[in-house]
Amino acid sequence: SGPEWNRHEFNAENIKPRDLYETYLPPFEALVKEGKVKEVMCAYNRFEGDPCCGSDRLLMQILRDEWGFDGIVLSDCGAIADFYRDYGHKTHLDAESASAAAVLSGTDLECGSSYEALVEAVKQGKIDEKAVDVAVKRLLMARFALGEMDEPEKVSWTGIPFSVVASAGHDSLALDMARKSMTLLMNKDNTLPLKRGGLTIAVMGPNANDSVMQWGNYNGMPPHTVTILDGIRKALGSDDRLIYEQGCGWVERAQIQSVFNRCKTADGKPGFTARYWNNVTRDGEPVTTAQVTTPFHFCTSGATVFAPGVNLTDFSATYNSVFTPDQSGEVVFDIYAYGSGRLRINGEEVRGFSNQHGGQKSAYTLQVQAGKMYDVELDFEYFRSDALLNFDLGFKNEVDVRKSVERVKDADVVVFVGGVSPNLEGEEMGVELPGFRGGDRTDIELPAVQRELIAALHHAGKKVVLVNCSGSPIGLEPETGRCGAILQAWYPGQAGGTAVAEVLFGDYNPAGRLPVTFYRNVS
């Protein structure tokens, strides 16, 4: 599908038939023929000059004719608009031409608004109404199969109660999945399992106390998450001692130490009070209110609303809290948004942001005094699809490797929880950092700042266990000589901290296997 940063204009061309049929197509073919999927999504990029959602070769000849697929083809969100907009492929003149071409090539359903032009396309003779009927029939057949036209009592899954969400059975399943995914890459000299009883353990690294990292991409929002730090802390015996020292961030030499937990609402509840309106002007009463207890990670991609009852488009939100720092210094209010809004401190607007074409980072630095209360209000509005709002606040600290090593000098073992994060690797992200571009990774090595800290711990004579969290391979060649054990924990979900701790202390025997090759280094 091409690089994330230019996929709206990228052209995959001169693909040899052998590569196409032996490398790129087999996973899709298996899902269609063996998995019997009912819906297939076409990509943003071009294939041999044609946008994938307008490719007869892919959607008609291969998918429908060769593989016999008779289900729905859905565009990726905004992909049809890429046919004609300036920052897209520009293969078509307008929405009418693009929509007609997509339907004629077999794209039945659009995620976006370009298909609104189909009525005019029919009037202009760019597509026959009978061709539109073919797509409409497929869509209606799918809705019939889902029971959308039947009485609720006739549809088996309408009787499933909401209480199954986050039920005990599902919590147990989350733990079981996390356990089974744990993959022990290396264990020298019986470094693992760790022995309880008078143990002093240091937990370090950017992923040790990050619940959001554990959720991965396109995730739900679990009501509770056991971080890896939490899991280790709960697994210790009464005679054991834990030292927590983050040490560094993922990539940058300056790290923000979150103080989100110092935010409380006016009635004393943790986090922010959220109010939502199904319009961008905040007319009328809010349609819903909610409590946000963790740093914000909201996104409407995949038809995920910010809160139950809130529109996917044409909505607004206001978040309020009182921040009371326990130390003085400079606090960074960190915003990453796809939409418009403003940040107010004590009623004064200190930062505005507006971006309707992808995510944009915005930050504000405030000198705070310990014990003083600061009213924080964040507004957000969006009227199109794919709204995004990430927000956190914290003290910005420069990485000091020497001091971090000194702080864990009494530890018998250091568990370094590192790797990368869904905030760095994912779909079309506004990330431009060493080793990362737009959601892609440009280097498979462990980020340099983490590598430096692990090396310093090794040189100080510390026994190091590396817990690597990532959704893709990491080159770990230097770490194999500097660590006693390496555990690949992936993005382990809401119960990930419990599963990692069970492996570290020998309460669960890891049996996971790598589904992808972990190369030793980039060469």
Residue ranges and their predicted role:
Residues S1-S523:
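Glycoside hydrolase catalytic-domain context in secreted enzymes
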